[in-house]
Structure formats: C-alpha cells, structure tokens
C-alpha cells in the first residue's frame, strides 16, 4: 500500500500544473484527469488523459474507456485502451468519434480489467459536437452596449455610480439643458442661479438657447425683415370710405366730409427710420436714372 501512494505522489509531482487536478469518480479508488466541457468530434486532446488507481494493481493491466448517454448508450471511442504502469494508465491519443447530441453530454465508464474487475462511472463529463466549441453566430456585445449607454448619459460616471439620496424633481434639468459652453453665456450668469424652484429659469434658458443658435445669415434676414416692416410705402395711400351711423340709418351715400375724415383716421403715419429714408432715396435715384436713360422702362433697383 505504501508503494501505491508513493507512485501516485511521484506521478502528481512529475505532471505540469494544469494536469495536477484529479477528478473523483463513482469509485473512491479510481481518479482521472479533468476533461474539457465541450470538444470537437474525432479530435485529440491537448494533454494526455490519465487514470490513477489508488489500489494495488499489477503492471500491464488493461484499462478501457466507454462513452454514452441515454439516447446513445455506446458511442465510438478511439484509442480507448491503455496499460497500467506504476498505478497510472496513460491514454496518449484518446478521441471521441461519436456525438453526444444537442444539449447532451457523455457519461464516462472506466473499466480496469483486473481480478476482481473494477468499474467507475462519471456522469455528464464532456459534450462532443461536430464543430466543437465556437463563438455564437449572432454575438451579443453586452459590454459595448453598456459603454455606449454610459457615453450617451449627460452626467459623468462618478456622479451616477455614487450612492446617495435621489435628486429632487425641481433640480432635474430638462433634456435640452446640456448646452455648449460658449461666449453666449456671460461669466456672471451661473452664480446668479441659486438652488430652489424658479419657474422663470427655464424660460430664460430657452430664450438664451434660441438666441445662441441663430446664425449670422439668420440674424441678417431678421434685420432686413424688420427694416422692410418699418419702412414707408412710396405709393400713394389708399382712401377708405367708412359710412357713419347716420348714413347707415338714412341709406344714403356718405358725404365728402366723411371721406376726408375717414381718410385722416385710416392713414397711419409711420415714423421714418434712417434705414427707410436711405432705401427711399435709393429708389428715387433709381427711378430718375431709369427715366433719364429709357423713359419707357421702370427699374425699381
């Protein structure tokens, strides 16, 4: 018995670090080296497969391996036989040719042909398929999605991950709040805002945001529209005849006095701005120049 433990100890010390892990079987006297969880059909393993015996067994005793499950009780295994040498049976090129099936694994049966015969079984040892272990056909990069979600957040990670009381509803900014920090914001704008419910802050921020988004072309167009609205019309003002209440009762045409009175009340005199005066002069000059060159053609500009 002392020789058995001596041989087993020497075997474990001589093996590299990955092969030192021995798995237990249904028999306490039979151990085996770990196998991969998933493997390809008819492919040799990277490391030899060992069966270690803790009971004294003479050398050159045959050890065989059987594989199967509920659907396939006995599948083909190549190089499934080995000889015992110093309590260790080494399988150099063990291959599982049969396939365990979809979602199923092989049960392993280790048989030591000694007197008496010893049998050990291990359930759900290895899964054998045609392709072997491979990546999914439609990968789901969960890590990249999480990174994109973190990048889309408006707050830094240290603020989000720190545990603390929930933020009150009055302090949560609207979705358009993260504006670019440009020259449109004066330096003294942010210190003026104190924490607390301010109903006029959102309107002020929206106004500042809309003004900051205006382009030079848009501002120029707005200025031109304002100048056109305030400029005076060169054509003669139209005279509106508004019948009085007496005329309506008598059903007679309105008098010339009412015509003059209505014309005075209907015409609104607009104060001329420097821009409107310049535009008026420009139009007058263009009219005179066009009359001097060709009196039949009128050129507004």
From Swiss-Prot:
Domain Runt intervals: 10-138
Q: Where in the cell is it found?
A: Nucleus
- Renumbered to this chain, region (Disordered) spans 237-301
- InterPro entries linked to this entry: AML1_Runt (IPR000040), p53-like_TF_DNA-bd_sf (IPR008967), p53/RUNT-type_TF_DNA-bd_sf (IPR012346), Runt_dom (IPR013524)
Carrying Phosphoserine, the residues are 255
The keyword Nuclease is annotated on this UniProt entry? no
Recorded hits in SUPFAM superfamilies, A to Z, give:
p53-like transcription factors (SSF49417)
Gene3D superfamilies attached here? 2.60.40.720
Low complexity: compositionally biased ranges: 285-301
The entry's note on the tissues where this protein occurs is:
Expressed in the intestine.
Gene deleted: what happens?
RNAi-mediated knockdown causes embryonic lethality and missing male-specific sense organs, known as rays. In hermaphrodites, RNAi-mediated knockdown causes a slight (5%) reduction in body length at adulthood.
A single GO molecular-function term is:
DNA-binding transcription activator activity, RNA polymerase II-specific
* PROSITE patterns referenced in this protein's UniProt entry, alphabetically: RUNT
**Tell me, what is an example of a GO biological process annotation in this record?**
positive regulation of locomotion involved in locomotory behavior
Identify the residues that bind chloride: 99, 130
One Pfam family linked to the record: Runt
- Which residues lie within the region annotated Interaction with DNA? 40-44, 95-103, 128-137
Q: Which GO terms describe its cellular component?
A: core-binding factor complex; nucleus
Q: Which UniProt keywords apply?
A: Developmental protein, Nucleus, Phosphoprotein, Transcription, Transcription regulation, Ubl conjugation
Could you confirm whether the keyword S-adenosyl-L-methionine appears in this record?
Answer: no
Q: What does the UniProt record say this protein does?
A: Transcription factor. Binds to regulatory DNA sequences in order to modulate transcription; negatively autoregulates its own expression, perhaps dependent upon CBF beta homolog bro-1. Promotes proliferation, and prevents differentiation, of seam cells, a stem cell-like lineage, acting in concert with bro-1. Required for controlling cell proliferation in the seam cells, perhaps by repressing expression of cyclin-dependent kinase inhibitor cki-1. Inhibition of seam cell differentiation is regulated by rnt-1 and bro-1, perhaps acting upstream of pop-1, by antagonizing pop-1 repressor function.
Query: What is said about its interaction partners and assembly?
Result: Interacts with CBFbeta homolog bro-1; acts to increase the affinity and specificity of interaction of rnt-1 with DNA. Interacts with TGF-beta pathway protein sma-4.
Write the protein's name: Runt-related transcription factor rnt-1
């Amino acid at each position: 018995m002392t020789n058995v433990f001596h041989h087993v100890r020497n075997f474990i010390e001589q093996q590299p670090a990955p092969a030192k892990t021995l798995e237990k079987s249904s028999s306490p006297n039979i151990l085996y080296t770990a196998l991969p969880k998933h493997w390809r059909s008819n492919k040799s393993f990277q490391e030899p497969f060992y069966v270690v015996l803790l009971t004294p067994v003479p050398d050159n005793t045959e050890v065989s391996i059987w594989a199967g499950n509920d659907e396939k009780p006995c599948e083909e295994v190549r190089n499934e036989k080995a000889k015992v040498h110093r309590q260790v049976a080494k399988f150099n090129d063990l291959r599982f040719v049969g396939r365990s099936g979809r979602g199923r694994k092989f049960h392993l049966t280790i048989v030591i042909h000694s007197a008496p015969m010893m049998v050990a079984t291990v359930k759900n040892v290895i899964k054998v398929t045609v392709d072997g272990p491979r990546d999914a056909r439609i990968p789901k990069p969960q890590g990249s999605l999480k990174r994109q979600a973190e990048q889309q957040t408006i707050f830094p990670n240290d603020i989000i991950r720190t545990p603390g009381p929930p933020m009150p509803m009055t302090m949560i900014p609207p979705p358009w709040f993260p504006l670019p920090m440009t020259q449109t914001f004066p330096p003294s704008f942010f210190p003026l805002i104190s924490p607390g419910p301010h109903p006029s802050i959102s309107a002020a921020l929206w106004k500042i945001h809309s003004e900051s988004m205006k382009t030079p072309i848009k501002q120029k167009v707005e200025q031109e529209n304002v100048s056109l609205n305030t400029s005076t019309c060169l054509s003669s003002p139209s005279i509106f005849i508004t019948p009085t209440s007496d005329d309506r009762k008598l059903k007679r045409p309105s008098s010339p006095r009412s015509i003059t009175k209505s014309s005075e009340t209907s015409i609104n005199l607009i104060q001329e701005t420097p821009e409107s005066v310049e535009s008026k002069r420009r139009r007058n000059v263009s009219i005179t120049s066009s009359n001097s060159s060709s009196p039949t053609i009128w050129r507004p500009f």
